Amino acid sequence: MENFNMPRSTTFYALGLSYKKADAVIRGKFSLDAQAQSDLLLQAKAEGIESLVVTSTCNRTEIYGFAHHPYELIKLLCENSNGSIEEFQQAAYIYKNEEAVSHMFRVGTGLDSQILGDFEIISQIKTAFNNSKQEGLVNTFLDRLVNTVIQASKKVKTETKISSGATSVSFASVQYIIRNVADIGSKNILLFGTGKIGRNTCENLVKHTKNSHITLINRTKNKAELLAGKLNVIVKDYADLKQELHQADVLVVATGAQNPTIDKASLALQKPLLILDLSIPRNVDANVEEIPGVTLIHLDALSQITDDTLERRKQHIPAAEAIIDDMKLELNTWVNGRKCAPTIHALKSKLNDIVSAEFAFQKKKITHFDDAQMDLISSRIIQKLTNHFASHLKNENTSVDQSIEFIEKIFQIGQLAPNKTSSPIADKYKINLS
């Protein structure tokens, strides 16, 4: 039987920082770009971490993985980001075992998103999962857990209305612009950066402002051109950024840089400028606010905008939580099955030994003993008996550990079953980690 090969003291953890306790500056320090995530995985592998997934978005940076102590994972995060242990302690959270599993379900189904019902995080989890899998850092439990969370996310999205209505960071950005800039249709709008949020914001700008003066600039021009071709907006070279800044009425910054790309020195303004910084880490230096007429709005302020759509979404939280409970029960059933399998296998072997011994005894006493018929009958009886035991062990109301101990004592099969390893995850999820 496949096993996890887990050390005795290994625990499953979910730890990180999110918008709930960490502001944009702190989240920026712990933000991990693609290279940093790759480096973290390689370091984890070198340090003997068997299974781990790392995600980093504008709203959260998290690690899900197995370790002897959470510090092993915290160390990985701090050594591959610009954050310190002290900063982590002040703003982070650490969950273990059952709580860690529950946290991943809430994150993956949009219940823990900064904007309720925003499912963008599940695509990040999928990408992170695939990256870890390529490095051989996904064990059987984490594989099953992530796939169950993905299924739960799909069910919540399709079977509830928790994501109904237009509510996202990009939508909130455009609504803020419309509410705060008069005659928006005639203003010059500059979008700097065409990542996921940048693309979505551009689409919303075109759709809701009816503005024909939207300009895109990206360090890699062909990415901007691909987006511009779909939306019929203007593309300019990165070299033209300073000139375009001079002409802009509204600037939306959505680059993926690790340091500010816009600062006071970049701007030589002769009219008011509204700047929306949708980046983590922040890509607009706070010193731009020293310039008269400049208004700087950051991602977190936009995410706090609530409206009727969000209130309607909240009504569907109970339905989403019911789906999560069902999927967690399904996961737990699978885990129970993995734990009881060695005992069931040993029980079947013990019953076969009893039958074989009885056959050998009876063949000496019974003339014309029919081996084939007795093999068929005994096999069917043994299968039915083991099925009954397996069904009992997999029942959600069964105390699996006590039942396994009872079966092993009655049939004296403790030595036949593989040695079981105790660990917190085994205790919580009744899973065999031998």
From Swiss-Prot:
Q: Which InterPro entries match?
A: 4pyrrol_synth_GluRdtase, 4pyrrol_synth_GluRdtase_dimer, 4pyrrol_synth_GluRdtase_N, GluRdtase_CS, GluRdtase_dimer_dom_sf, GluRdtase_N_sf, NAD(P)-bd_dom_sf, Shikm_DH/Glu-tRNA_Rdtase
- List the Gene3D superfamilies: Glutamyl-tRNA reductase, N-terminal domain, NAD(P)-binding Rossmann-like Domain
The record places the active site at 58 (nucleophile)
Which GO biological process categories is it annotated with?
protoporphyrinogen IX biosynthetic process from glutamate
Ranges in a coiled coil: none
In which pathway does this enzyme or protein participate? Porphyrin-containing compound metabolism; protoporphyrin-IX biosynthesis; 5-aminolevulinate from L-glutamyl-tRNA(Glu): step 1/2
Looking at its record, which EC class is this enzyme? Answer: oxidoreductase
Keyword annotations from UniProtKB, A to Z: NADP, Oxidoreductase, Porphyrin biosynthesis
Provide the disulphide bond pattern: none
Q: Name one Pfam family in it.
A: GlutR_N
What CDD domains does UniProt report for this protein, alphabetically? NAD_bind_Glutamyl_tRNA_reduct
Q: Which GO terms describe its molecular function?
A: glutamyl-tRNA reductase activity; NADP binding
The positions annotated as site (Important for activity) read 103
- Catalytic reaction(s) noted: (S)-4-amino-5-oxopentanoate + tRNA(Glu) + NADP(+) = L-glutamyl-tRNA(Glu) + NADPH + H(+)
| EC number(s) on file | 1.2.1.70
Q: Where does substrate bind?
A: 57-60, 113, 118-120, 124
**Free-text function comment from the UniProt entry:** Catalyzes the NADPH-dependent reduction of glutamyl-tRNA(Glu) to glutamate 1-semialdehyde (GSA).
Cite the domain annotation text: Possesses an unusual extended V-shaped dimeric structure with each monomer consisting of three distinct domains arranged along a curved 'spinal' alpha-helix. The N-terminal catalytic domain specifically recognizes the glutamate moiety of the substrate. The second domain is the NADPH-binding domain, and the third C-terminal domain is responsible for dimerization.
Q: Please state which protein family the record places this protein in.
A: Belongs to the glutamyl-tRNA reductase family.
Spell out the subunit comment: Homodimer.
Q: What else is known?
A: During catalysis, the active site Cys acts as a nucleophile attacking the alpha-carbonyl group of tRNA-bound glutamate with the formation of a thioester intermediate between enzyme and glutamate, and the concomitant release of tRNA(Glu). The thioester intermediate is finally reduced by direct hydride transfer from NADPH, to form the product GSA.
The name this protein carries in UniProt is Glutamyl-tRNA reductase 2
Organism this protein belongs to: Flavobacterium johnsoniae (strain ATCC 17061 / DSM 2064 / JCM 8514 / BCRC 14874 / CCUG 350202 / NBRC 14942 / NCIMB 11054 / UW101)
- Gene name, per UniProt, is hemA2
